[in-house]
């Protein structure tokens, strides 16, 4: 279960079916993340990409805060269906576009489609191999997915030490960390 922390659906509790193997971002980490994002960005005006969307907690939190252009990519059919049904229940269908796809395959194809995003959030499985973390970062930062001066947030286990030239900072919240990247206009 997770709770929408702020916005139009503040306090709304959403329970995923018990047979879903998911790890929604904790309320504590979620609140900290959105405090940072809302301080830096006008969420209502952004184009957002939510990768490894799981059951959609980040997408729904963004929609609740007024974000109108959210693309959620999730490979698991049941999870994607849950995001879709929850978006309908909360009247977020016009704000959240759910795509069922392997994130890595989708990113490789998306670079040729011309759409880029102001904010990219990725919450890959915690057991993702280190080389795939680096591939994910590279695909997002170097393939036109993130707009110039856009913000990419990678959620990962705190024990993973992420390094990259475009890494701005990492914030730790217990076992979870958020690494913030900015694609700068000038290298």
What are these regions (language model features)?
Residues 1-187:
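Class I S-adenosyl-L-methionine-dependent methyltransferase catalytic core
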């Amino acid at each position: 279960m997770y709770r929408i922390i702020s916005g139009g659906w503040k306090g709304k509790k959403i329970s995923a079916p018990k047979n879903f193997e998911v790890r929604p971002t904790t309320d504590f980490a979620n609140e900290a993340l959105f405090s940072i994002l809302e301080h830096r960005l006008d969420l209502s005006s952004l184009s957002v990409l939510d990768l490894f969307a799981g059951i959609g907690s980040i997408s729904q939190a963004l929609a609740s805060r007024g974000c109108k252009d959210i693309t959620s990519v999730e490979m698991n059919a049941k999870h994607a269906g849950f995001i879709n049904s929850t978006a309908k229940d909360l009247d977020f269908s016009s704000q959240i576009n759910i795509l069922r796809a392997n994130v890595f395959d989708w990113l490789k194809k998306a670079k040729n489609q011309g759409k880029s995003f102001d904010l990219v959030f990725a919450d890959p499985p915690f057991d993702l191999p280190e080389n795939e973390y680096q591939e994910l970062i590279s695909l997002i930062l170097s393939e036109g997915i993130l707009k110039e001066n856009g913000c990419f947030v990678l959620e990962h286990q705190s024990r993973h030490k992420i390094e990259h030239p475009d890494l701005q900072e990492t914030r730790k919240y217990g076992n979870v960390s958020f690494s913030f990247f900015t694609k700068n206009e000038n290298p």
